[in-house]
């Protein structure tokens, strides 16, 4: 048995034990009886490109597990970057720039139980537009998504996927969001539109991600992670 086989068999055994112990198969609905939902952001300028292939595969597997999903495309129009004006601190829940997709996406945070962000790789980085959306939406309406499970997906032709994957995960870890993993980094390979559908291992990784996301939502009943709970925030500035 090689290392990968050992890891997979161990993970399957542990997962089976956890499922049996918690009875999560019966928990597709949260305590209010609402079917849980994953918001997925397609951060590609191409609505039906390879990022869509990845998110569609996740959506299909979520449905198998009884979890709803919605894919929101950021579009291919200009998206403003954050200018650190502080307007969202004076008017929480809304970015002062209301002429692009950002506020419409952040409005969907409240009704979502989890978040998945997918992006193509440009020069070893995620698409700049999706980074602008996430930064502004998290600043202005982060309270609505804080503590909810999250995952990132990077799609590339050849290289830069791991760096992009790490960049996309950064905001989640600052918002008390449990980051959901898979059997490998959440990466899919493809150049021409639709070519990622040939990446059989990558597609399996997407399905495993969907299974893990479903398991976590069912195990927690869709309840966000507590973070620091009622403890006041304690900041520290090393510049005196």
Regions found by a protein language model. Give the residues of each.
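N-terminal beta-loop-helix "entrance" segment that forms/cooperates
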Residues: 75-93, 195
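N-terminal secretory signal peptides and thylakoid transit peptides that target proteins
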Residues: 1-14
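A generic structural motif
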Residues: 65-70, 177
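C-terminal segment of N-terminal export signals and the immediately downstream linker at the start
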Residues: 22-54
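A short, Lys/Arg-enriched amphipathic alpha-helix followed by its capping loop at the start of a domain
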Residues: 57-67
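Helix-loop-strand module that forms the ligand-binding subsite of alpha/beta enzymes
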Residues: 36, 90-184
